[in-house]
Amino acid sequence: PEEAIEAYNKALTLKPDYAEAYNNMGIVLQDQGKPEEAIEAYNKALTLKPDYAEAWNNIVFPLRSIKSKISLSEELTSYYPKDTGSNNYEIYRATLNYIMNLGAAQAENTLDEALKALGNSENIVIKNPDYDSRNIGSKMPLTDKVVALVHWGRSGTGLLHSLIDDHPEVSTLPSIYLSEHFNHSNWERMISDGWSQMADRFMAMYDVIFDAKSKAPVHSKSLILLYNIGLKEGMANVGDQRDEVLKVDKKLFCAELQRLMSFYDQLDALLFFKLVHRAYDKAISDIHQKSLIFYHIHNPNAHAQLNFVRLAPEANWVMMVREPVQSCESWLRKNFEKNDYTGVATRIITMLFEIDTIIYHKQKSVGVRLEDLKESPRRTVPALCNWMGIKDNESLYEMTAQGKKWWGDPSSPDHAQDGMNPFGKTSINRKIGSIFSESDQYILQTLFYPFSLRFGYVEENAEQFEIDLQVIRPMMDEMFDFEKTIAEQTQVDPEQFMKSGSYLYLRSGLIERWNILKEFGTYPNMIRPLKIN
């Protein structure tokens, strides 16, 4: 690490305006457990390159690492990047402030500020240079109903999506390809070549929709590029014999999308999104009249999620949930096996904050228990249909993708040689303990208690909860047993391990969640469970 810092300093001596070097230096400093210095490096990168999305994303980690230690007289915002004249500065800053205040008392205010900043942005619509108002009579009505599906840990979003897939009233694209469609930078790329090239640009950005074997990447959370995502999600071995590849005819899709676009004088990301679904249905010969778009937004970054909320304020949200500690252990299993401590820490914090998201509290939203879907599908599915405003249908009890039999996510620990049983109970019956010791579980179960109570995973015991909160606070200052295992596997001295950036990030987030529970006794913005008669 020290050699890396020295190398970046040399590079900056030769090229003082090298923003990427400052960004990379920030990553190293954060890993070393020097969050203040990392923040300084990211700020320098953003002074040189104000729209540097990666640096805006990276600065969240050191800010989170110091947040729990900042005194009441000090404002976290003093560490934020300063405005250097960027057109998108207010968007980036407001989004950052929203992220840093998830679950806080001022969460609603920061949400409103972020939505306002996004709404004031330039280039949020693109105009049709060849618009002919005489075409208006040919325009077909588009559905206003959109249901967005988000995950929480490993909780079965792929399963639910596959059950919804072939419903005659629902339009949905396969997999999670479009999870970052509403990210401002993605939309800017979409319209960068002008109106006439948008259909081609979409097909290039999402080539995997048209051939599940495509190796072309799609953008995911935190600017990560996902390669071979169609293969990894099992979209290239569908059908009764597992020998079919999901494909869409590009010529048919492009022609239909361009035809639909011609009826509009301008488009924003949401309207274009709806036209894409209409063109997709036409290209796969789905002739059913659709009343709803089911959007597997999955695990979007804050920017994409906020922009979707701004454009589709009436959209409904569904979160798949599962017993929290079991869900968490399953989700971070691969990170743990690779000794990827940063990934483990990030996923634990993500789950603890996502249960307290103001968006789900304000919007029409429900949480669907994986356990209910597995154990009582004939009660749970109709209840969800009623909530979504669609009819129950036999297609809802089979796993499909583009109407073809889907055999499940190959990365799932429950993906057997003969595929997955949609209502098999292996996942929900799996015992906890492969990663988390009893001590680890006790801390996490206490922090997840309000959510577990709301969703019926535990019986209410407020007095014991108060006791548990007090007991776990000093325990959180020590290493978890799973952390000791990673330190041993990676041959890192425990004292040095506790100085790492990921350790500080995890501890600061845990303490922040503990403080909220101590103050309010619950998480104020939790999603509500689906009511099942």
Regions found by a protein language model. Give the residues of each.
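Conserved alpha-helical positions within TPR/SEL1-like repeat arrays
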Residues: 8-9, 20-31, 54-61, 91
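PAPS-dependent sulfation machinery
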Residues: 176-296
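PAPS-dependent sulfotransferase catalytic domain
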Residues: 246-397, 405-422, 528-532
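Residue-level recognition of tetratricopeptide repeat
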Residues: 18, 52, 83-88
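PAPS-dependent sulfotransferases, especially Golgi type II membrane carbohydrate sulfotransferases
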Residues: 103-141, 146-147, 390-533
